[in-house]
Amino acid sequence: MATNKSGLNPENYASVVDGKKTALYVLTNKQGAEMCVCNYGGIIVSLMMPDRDGKLDNVVLGLSNIEDMKKRVDPYLGAAIGRYGNRIANGKFTINGVEYTLPQNDNTNCLHGGLSGFESKVWDAEQTDEQTLVLRYTSVDGEEGFPGNLDIVMTYKLTDENEVCIDYKATTDKPTLCNLTNHSFFNLNGISGKAEAPVITNNVLTLNCDKFIPVDAIAIPVGVKTPVEGTPFDFRQPALVADRIDDNDTQIKYGSGIDHSFCINQKNEGEMTLAAVCECPATGRVLSTYTTEPGLQVYSGNFLNGTVGVGGTVFQRRSGICFEAQHHPDCINQPKFEQCILNPGETYSQTTVYAFSVK
């Protein structure tokens, strides 16, 4: 029986995976917004946010039960991503002269931490109040080929200002890579009760980014940061997504749309900065993404292909858009990019805020 505004049945998310219990956690705020999270993968399953008329609707893509999650039916929908969000070329990297080899699960690349990344792990969960969920996971030395025991604390908070705040902290006992993010697919049209999720091509996007990261045919950076001026990646002024994602530009063709990392215009390293504003004129919903990270992977849902999700809604191609705050792809093998090596005695710290409003 549903006990939440999203219409989700908590029993559908209750299971035991690798000896750990999974459950659905419901966060609410004073404005009536609601976020449902499963501790399997730290997955944001649903997010009820108001439109300009105050009507609540689910604005993220999620799966309707734990079994689909375990079967890896679109495994990254709403999930926590690690140890390394995005791609590492050839599944190889070197730290302090030691080469490490990772699974190649995306062409010859290692994508999102390997064959079994954080999206498929059961996190220890503690709901500290109506608005806050604390998730903990220890990635053991050698997991998916990464060195060091990595202890992660990830905190989800739904504020009274309709912000989804995700705070990450991590420590290690060996030099390792740490590049965490969230892979929510947003749909500001709202998907509740719809047979098919509407496409997000009617959204208007603005990016606080003067440069982006061009890639090769298998999505590995070519090693430079390129000005967006004169390219379909120039969102410094508001632009309709539909006008850009089918451009004849080679980079657009490589990604079958937008699937690129953008360089956020940060004044100081690690400073919380507005990275993106996405607006849906049809509903009035506005999503503003703030982060302490240097990069924002924008993905226009080009490879969504008919997965049936929450409420029986079909997720068609381009029915969600991702704003994945992180370090740039393959940065460990790209000397011109900001690095994400974490050493013993240091604390990895990252905060991303998805702030919702209406206009």
Q: Which residues are covered by each model-predicted region?
A:
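An exposed, glycine/acidic-rich loop-and-rim segment of catalytic or binding clefts
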Residues: A2-K359
